[in-house]
């Protein structure tokens, strides 16, 4: 690899990020909790409208606590508007997917956009069919449970990506003034 190629690769890695994308979220507490996870993992949050609640919903703000000012937040009027600005690998998270989310590769230097569907209906069926090769599944027992909570799913997926990336940009160890373990 030439020096120029190495510099370009390193620049790409520095610019690469994980992004969480919510398609028409319906439950304010889920969105607030996801916002908090995004703030904790340095992941921008993208929301595709319409939402099932107003953006200033008290329940959403409470679930996100006081982390809203630490969050990079983007809104889109429709799915196509988001797709047109998506400059990275798109992953559709769905119970209908064949590929396991933990077997995908996220440590490749690209930006990764993880798209999660509505809590009640998921992602649009035609969109899923058109992009089936990008769909990832979290294994679960489908006989007993219809789906996993979207907030929990976001957390599992983002931390798997971060694990593969060596938790880049996150504190692996922190010293607390009042450490409960000492």
Curated annotation (Swiss-Prot):
Pfam families registered for this protein in UniProt: SpoU_methylase
Keyword annotations from UniProtKB, A to Z: Cytoplasm, Methyltransferase, S-adenosyl-L-methionine, Transferase, tRNA processing
InterPro entries reported in the protein's UniProt record: Alpha/beta_knot_MTases, SpoU_MeTrfase, TrmL, tRNA_m1G_MTases_N
One GO location term (cellular component): cytoplasm
Cellular localization per UniProt: Cytoplasm
CDD domains, A to Z: SpoU-like_TrmL (cd18094)
GO function term, MF aspect, one: tRNA (5-carboxymethylaminomethyluridine(34)-2'-O)-methyltransferase activity
Catalysed reaction, written as an equation: cytidine(34) in tRNA + S-adenosyl-L-methionine = 2'-O-methylcytidine(34) in tRNA + S-adenosyl-L-homocysteine + H(+); 5-carboxymethylaminomethyluridine(34) in tRNA(Leu) + S-adenosyl-L-methionine = 5-carboxymethylaminomethyl-2'-O-methyluridine(34) in tRNA(Leu) + S-adenosyl-L-homocysteine + H(+)
Main location: cytoplasm
GO biological process, one term: wobble position ribose methylation
Keyword tRNA processing carried by entry: yes
This enzyme's EC code(s): 2.1.1.207
Keyword set includes Cytoplasm: yes
Binding site for S-adenosyl-L-methionine: 93, 117, 138, 147
Gene3D superfamilies with a match to the protein in the record: 3.40.1280.10
PANTHER family, sorted: TRNA (CYTIDINE(34)-2'-O)-METHYLTRANSFERASE (PTHR42971:SF1)
Similarity remark: Belongs to the class IV-like SAM-binding methyltransferase superfamily. RNA methyltransferase TrmH family. TrmL subfamily.
Function: Could methylate the ribose at the nucleotide 34 wobble position in tRNA.
Protein name: Putative tRNA (cytidine(34)-2'-O)-methyltransferase
């Amino acid at each position: 690899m030439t020096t120029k190629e190495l510099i370009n690769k390193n620049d790409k890695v520095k610019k690469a990020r994980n992004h969480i994308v919510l398609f028409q979220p319906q439950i304010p507490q889920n969105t607030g909790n996801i916002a908090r996870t995004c703030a904790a993992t340095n992941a921008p949050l993208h929301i595709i409208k319409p939402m099932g609640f107003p953006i200033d919903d008290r329940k959403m703000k409470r679930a996100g606590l006081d982390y809203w000012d630490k969050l990079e937040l983007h809104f889109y009027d429709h799915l196509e508007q988001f797709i047109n600005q998506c400059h990275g690998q798109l992953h559709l998270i769905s119970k209908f997917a064949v590929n396991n989310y933990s077997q995908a590769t996220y440590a490749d230097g690209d930006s990764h956009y993880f798209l999660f569907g509505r809590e009640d209906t998921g992602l649009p069926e035609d969109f899923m069919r058109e992009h089936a090769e990008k769909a990832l599944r979290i294994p679960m027992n489908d006989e007993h449970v219809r789906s996993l909570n979207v907030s929990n799913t976001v957390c599992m997926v983002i931390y798997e990506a971060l694990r593969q990336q060596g938790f880049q940009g996150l504190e692996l160890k922190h010293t607390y003034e009042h450490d409960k373990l000492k």
